[in-house]
């Protein structure tokens, strides 16, 4: 093994002297290859310099004894590079062992190579001490040992100091302090004679020579002139190796031959080693060491050990695997393989017994077994006492008096503790099974919170605050109406409008109410429903109220008291529209009419408590209504008859409407101011103005009656409003009245606290009624008749019309429901001789007073027609009263609405809704959720309406929803005002109506007349128009018909009247409103419509009627229905496809309604659809698509309630019914949303004034005229849709 010898001899040419300082300098200037070699000398290495490559490379020349330098250099990888034999060898291929053999030789021994081929073995301890060099002195170089990674140092004769003349090398065992004379095994050590190979030590191989103060570059060539290491620390390669094996198992063989095993801990510059847990290894026993033999730590001096062996080391670990945490930790901590899991076989165990941890308190080992085991194996006896007598005092039960006293005292203390709030809170926390999300999320996903809007798709939907009002309108109009019942009391529509406006403010129940009515609603309003007003206002919350319509009314009544002012405004506008007689609607400015309606709504709030109460329950409604009849009934008939019927509060709402009506044109142009003030001022003013209102009083008295009578009353109010509106003075008066109304409404609101309880009671009754009604439609009709009778009786006190209405309702319960709509439609459409005469007459009769009290009936849009209708209604006042259930039947008054047209700006679609008196709609919105009163959500609610009113076409109601969508944003009352001035009701609530109302008026000039009734609805539903696009887009085709019809019907007081869409249950409300509004007095389809309409009215139609004052307006003129068809009706009818002929659409609606029987509002929409299609008048319409088209005579019913608007309202899926309805209607559902609005728009052939549809992009359809109105065409629907948007 002379590879090292050859390597060492390379520098032979160089004198030892060159190793001196001069030599160092020269060395520094050597080529890098030479320097890398680590060998000293001033001359470059000879050509033979490069050591053999590879661990097993045969040495050049004769083999010399192994030396450490060769071990590191030639054995290592670095051997491949010149001069890198030493340390690089350590980094070479992995070796199983690293053995350091220290051959101790006398320091003075001249350097001599071991005989060739002879491998020097380390001397035993028996070696004479003279042969052992002093520790730390340079050791002779050894030649590499090939094979396993072992390092051995064999004694090498050191040349005398003078001979070597080299700087002591940093050999493996050499130290910088070694005498220069000692020829260190440094890589630089050079032997003078070639025969005397100087093997560089492993330390030298490291390239770190003691003399190299700067520190060797080693193979990196990074000079470190300022750093110097002592001893072996200067040998970088050796340091690397020794450091890498720290912590490894190490065997040290000492000079005496003993072998010690331990864990290598550290080393010193002098190569002293420290082993932890060291013990002497005996070859005899293979067993491990004994504890007493293990020494914690042992230091082996460099002079004491011969060989150091590290077992199981991997010197190439740094070059093999990736340096990832997992890879490194796997090496250090062992292999972490996935454990093989084995299936556990429980055997005979049963999970209920042995495996139940809760029942096993032994922690897996029975204490007795443990004690026994310890005793048997260790003789330890346990003193454990299961009674724990050492820690507790056992209670000795006895019957002594003292013990019993103490026991009683203990029980008392325990009860006190357990009943404390702290304890309960702590226990609740411990036992709370809710997840973190349920506890802290802002999104409430509890379906029960939604009060039975189960069918609605938004059960578990998070509705952003910005959209909650619309959603509430769509599917929570009833509910919202309920909370706002106080405000919308007079009619679902007003209530709904208020609701929607409120819903728009749904974020803060009271805030919304404040916005709507200018007066915050009291929390009671939501009390009826499980969720708070804000909840009602919120979209999702609104939905449940819809489902829980019955409960809603009570909630509304409470809310009405708190929010009467605002609600009256918001509701008032819609309710008056539907409530106002045609004549009023036509006469009064349409816009004013909506305002008037809003004010009546305020009144409604004040009197609505009775109304609401009765609305909640027909019976209940009747008494409260009667109690509050003078004040409430007056307003209720005007704007909230429907509402009162549906929600009980409607009456109040009508009152509010009436104040509005006065404002618009209370009873007359001159009375408008007083009437408005009166209703707003509160019940007293309502009474003052309500001399006519009492006629409507019966309507509030009983939900059914309210429905039947309300339409007539609303019709009257509509007429009055229309008259007022028609006359500039009346309009101004109405406006003023409306303005003043808010304050009065507020006052009423405040005074409504008693109403809250009544409302609640009514809600309960309504719920019962709803359930009964669903189960027994016929009985429901009867109950409605009874309720209507009661209402009529209430009204009887004021007017004989009530009796007629009662008879009318009893005559046709299906008609009654249909009548409701028809009433709305009829009263709206007084111009329609066949239906309007009796119905409108009654409505007018009623409305006349109502208008006085409500002053502003939303029928102002149909002012002109309403005027005519009004006169007509005067003749048939009794009949109209009989159809009190159809406050929406109030004259369609689209023309009246044409005046409000200026406010139409906000929403073009609105105009469609406007035509309908919205009075009915107003009344309806509150009932939307109160719907149970009027009709079970799924049951058809027969609306006792005068036979003339019966022909109300459900389709007309549908259009209303168009506005509903916008109205839903009632919360954004400001938007509503845009739609119409009347919406400016003194209360915030007016805003929604205003927003909805003006657009209705402005959009369809002809429509206005036609939509006069609707205009009021739009007031409350003003958002309807605005929201319609929203809702329509949401569920345009699917929900619009059903939702609109039903929702409106259910929640006419809330938003149906002013703007179905605006209402919380805008979706439903709008449609329902539309239906109600559409319920045209058209006799041709009266019967056919009646049955189908019955359903529509029962569930949707009535709701729509109230929801859509327009419906009332429409009734006022049979042809207005075409007007409605152009925009509103078509949509209403379309249910899902407004292109289909109204009959088809109506049929679809019927089917949808059937589908939605569970969902009253939706159902109503469907039914109304079914009714609408049948009417021949509608069929004659040029546009088959447009439902309105189907109903030429009932066109008024259509009263250009933009179906698209309605649909948008329904678009929000407040009720399951929406979807079914849409589907039922036809595959057109999709088209509905987009094309609805324009289709809804219908050119008013007869009425030119309403032609100014510009606002709604709808052709105004004269409500008064009977002529069919050409539909704008579906393109107009698009326009209408835009309008909604």
UniProtKB/Swiss-Prot annotation:
Compositional bias (Basic and acidic residues): 428-440, 447-461, 757-773, 790-813, 864-881
Quote the function comment for this protein: Involved in EGFR trafficking, acting as negative regulator of endocytic EGFR internalization at the plasma membrane.
User: Quick one: where's region Disordered?
Assistant: 1-85, 111-178, 197-224, 428-925, 1111-1191
* InterPro entries linked: ATXN2-like, LSM_dom_sf, LsmAD_domain, PAM2_motif, Sm, SM_dom_ATX
Placement of covalent cross-link Glycyl lysine isopeptide (Lys-Gly) (interchain with G-Cter in SUMO2): 864
Cellular location(s): Cytoplasm
Q: Where is the composition biased (Pro residues)?
A: 48-65, 554-567
Q: Which Pfam families match?
A: LsmAD (PF06741), PAM2 (PF07145), SM-ATX (PF14438)
Question: Does this entry carry the keyword Ubl conjugation?
Answer: yes
The protein in question is named Ataxin-2
* Location of Phosphothreonine modifications: 710
Q: Gly residues bias: where?
A: 205-214
Q: Does the keyword Magnesium apply?
A: no
């Amino acid at each position: 093994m002379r590879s090292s010898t050859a390597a060492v001899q390379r520098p032979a040419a160089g004198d030892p002297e060159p190793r001196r300082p001069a030599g160092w300098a020269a060395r520094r200037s050597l080529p890098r290859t030479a320097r890398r070699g680590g060998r000293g000398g001033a001359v470059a290495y000879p050509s033979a310099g490069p050591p053999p490559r590879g661990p097993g490379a045969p040495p050049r020349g004769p083999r010399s004894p192994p030396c450490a330098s060769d071990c590191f250099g030639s054995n290592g990888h670095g051997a491949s590079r010149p001069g890198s034999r030493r340390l690089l060898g350590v980094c070479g291929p992995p070796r199983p062992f690293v053995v350091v053999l220290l051959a101790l030789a006398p320091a003075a021994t001249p350097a001599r190579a071991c005989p060739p081929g002879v491998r020097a073995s380390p001397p035993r301890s028996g070696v004479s001490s003279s042969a052992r060099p002093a520790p730390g002195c340079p050791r002779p170089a050894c030649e590499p040992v090939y094979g396993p990674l072992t390092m051995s140092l064999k004694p090498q004769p050191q040349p005398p100091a003078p001979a070597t003349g080299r700087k002591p090398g940093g050999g493996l065992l050499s130290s910088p302090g070694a005498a220069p004379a000692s020829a260190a095994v440094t890589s630089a050590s050079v032997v003078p004679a070639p025969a005397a190979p100087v093997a560089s030590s492993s330390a030298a191989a490291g390239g770190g020579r003691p003399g190299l103060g700067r520190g060797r570059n080693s193979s990196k060539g990074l000079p470190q002139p300022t750093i110097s290491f002592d001893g072996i620390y200067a040998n970088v390669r050796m340091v690397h190796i020794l450091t890498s094996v720290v912590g490894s198992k190490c065997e040290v063989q000492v000079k005496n031959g003993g072998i010690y095993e331990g864990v290598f801990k550290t080393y010193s510059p002098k190569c002293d080693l420290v082993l932890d847990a060291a013990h002497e290894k005996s070859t005899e026993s293979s067993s491990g060491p004994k504890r007493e033999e293990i020494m914690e730590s042992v230091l082996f001096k460099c002079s004491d050990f011969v060989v150091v062996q590290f077992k199981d080391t991997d010197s190439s670990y740094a070059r093999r695997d990736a340096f990832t945490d997992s890879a490194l930790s796997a090496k250090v901590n062992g292999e972490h393989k996935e454990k093989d899991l084995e299936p556990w076989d429980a055997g005979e165990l049963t999970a209920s017994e042995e495996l139940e941890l809760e029942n096993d308190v032994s922690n897996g080992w029975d204490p007795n077994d443990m004690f026994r085991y310890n005793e048997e194996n260790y003789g330890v006896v346990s003193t454990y006492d299961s009674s724990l007598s050492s820690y507790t005092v056992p209670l000795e039960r006895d019957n002594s008096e003292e013990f019993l006293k103490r026991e009683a005292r203990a029980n008392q203390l325990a009860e006190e503790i357990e009943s404390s709030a702290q304890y309960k809170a702590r226990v609740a926390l411990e036992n709370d099974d809710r997840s973190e999300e349920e506890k802290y999320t802002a999104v409430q996903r509890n379906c029960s919170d939604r009060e039975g809007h189960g069918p609605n798709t938004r059960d578990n939907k998070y509705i952003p605050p910005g959209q909650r009002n619309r959603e509430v309108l769509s599917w929570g109009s009833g509910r919202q109406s309920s909370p706002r019942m106080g405000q919308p009391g007079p009619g679902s529509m007003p209530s709904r409008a208020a609701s929607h406006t409120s819903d728009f403010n749904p974020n803060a129940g009271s805030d919304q109410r404040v916005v709507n009515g200018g007066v915050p609603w009291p929390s009671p309003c939501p009390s009826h429903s499980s969720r708070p007003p804000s909840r009602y206002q919120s979209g999702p919350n609104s939905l449940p109220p819809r489902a829980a319509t019955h409960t809603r009314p009570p909630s509304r009544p409470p809310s009405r008291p708190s929010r009467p002012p605002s609600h009256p405004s918001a509701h008032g506008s819609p309710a008056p529209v539907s409530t106002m007689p045609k004549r009023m609607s036509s006469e009064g400015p349409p816009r004013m009419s909506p305002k008037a309606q809003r004010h009546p709504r305020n009144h409604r709030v004040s009197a609505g408590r009775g109304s609401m109460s009765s609305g909640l329950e027909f019976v209940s409604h009747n008494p409260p209504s009667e109690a509050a009849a003078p004040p409430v009934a007056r307003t209720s008939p005007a704007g909230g008859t429907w509402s009162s019927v549906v929600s009980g509060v409607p009456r109040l709402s009508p009152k509010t409407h009436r104040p509005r009506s006065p404002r618009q044109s209370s009873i007359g142009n001159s009375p408008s101011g007083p009437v408005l003030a009166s209703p707003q001022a509160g019940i007293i003013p309502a009474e003052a103005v309500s001399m006519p209102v009492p006629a409507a009083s019966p309507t509030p008295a009983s939900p059914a009656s309210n429905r039947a009578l309300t339409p007539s009353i609303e019709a009257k109010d509509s007429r009055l409003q229309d008259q007022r509106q028609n006359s500039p003075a009346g309009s101004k008066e109405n406006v003023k009245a409306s303005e003043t109304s808010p304050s009065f409404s507020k006052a009423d609101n405040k005074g409504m606290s008693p109403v809250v309880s009544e409302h609640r009671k009514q809600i309960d009754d309504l719920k019962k009624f709803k359930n009964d009604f669903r189960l027994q439609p016929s009985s429901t009709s009867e109950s409605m008749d009874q309720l209507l009778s009661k209402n009529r009786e209430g009204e009887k006190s004021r007017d004989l019309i009530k009796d007629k209405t009662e008879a009318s309702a009893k005559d046709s319960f299906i008609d009654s429901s249909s009548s409701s709509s028809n009433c709305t439609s009829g009263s709206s459409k007084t111009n329609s001789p066949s239906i309007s005469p009796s119905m409108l007459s009654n409505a007018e009769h009623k409305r006349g007073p109502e208008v006085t009290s409500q002053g502003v009936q939303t029928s102002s849009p149909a002012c002109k027609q309403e005027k005519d209708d009004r006169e007509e209604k005067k003749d048939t006042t009794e009949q109209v009263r009989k159809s009190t259930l159809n406050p929406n039947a109030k004259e369609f008054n689209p023309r009246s609405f044409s005046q409000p047209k200026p406010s139409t700006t906000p929403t073009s679609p609105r105009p469609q809704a406007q035509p309908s008196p919205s009075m009915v709609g107003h009344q309806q919105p509150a009932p939307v959720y109160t719907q149970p009163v009027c009709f079970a959500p799924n049951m058809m609610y027969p609306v006792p309406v005068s036979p003339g009113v019966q022909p109300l076409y459900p389709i007309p109601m549908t259009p209303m929803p168009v506005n509903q969508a916008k109205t839903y944003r009632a919360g954004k009352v400001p938007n509503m005002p845009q739609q119409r001035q009347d919406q400016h009701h003194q209360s915030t609530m007016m805003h929604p109506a205003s927003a909805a109302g003006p657009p209705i008026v402005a959009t369809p000039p002809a429509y206005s007349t036609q939509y006069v009734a609707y205009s009021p609805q739009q007031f409350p539903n003003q958002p309807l128009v605005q929201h319609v696009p929203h809702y329509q887009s949401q569920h345009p085709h699917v929900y619009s018909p059903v939702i609109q019809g039903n929702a409106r019907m259910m929640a006419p007081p809330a938003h149906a009247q002013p703007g179905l869409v605006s209402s919380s249950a805008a979706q439903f409300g709008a449609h329902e409103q539309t239906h109600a509004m559409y319920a045209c007095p058209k006799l041709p389809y009266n019967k056919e419509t009646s049955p189908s309409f019955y359903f529509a009215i029962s569930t949707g139609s009535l709701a729509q009627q109230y929801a859509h004052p327009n419906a009332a307006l429409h009734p006022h003129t049979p042809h207005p229905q075409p007007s409605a068809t152009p925009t509103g009706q078509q949509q209403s009818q379309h249910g899902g496809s407004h292109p289909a002929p109204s009959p088809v659409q109506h049929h679809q609606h019927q089917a949808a309604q059937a589908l939605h029987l569970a969902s009253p509002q939706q159902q109503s929409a469907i039914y109304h659809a079914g009714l609408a299609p049948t009417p021949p008048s509608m069929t004659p319409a040029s546009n088959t698509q447009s439902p309105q088209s189907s109903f030429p005579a009932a066109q008024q019913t259509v009263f250009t309630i933009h179906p698209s608007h309605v649909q948008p309202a329904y678009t929000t899926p407040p009720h399951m019914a929406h979807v079914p309805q849409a589907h039922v209607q036809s595959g057109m559902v999709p088209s509905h949303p987009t094309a609805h609005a324009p289709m809804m728009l219908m050119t008013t052939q007869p009425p030119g004034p309403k032609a100014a549809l510009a606002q709604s992009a709808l052709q105004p359809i004269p409500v008064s005229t009977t002529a069919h109105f050409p539909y704008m065409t579906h393109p107009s629907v698009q326009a209408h849709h835009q309008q909604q948007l």
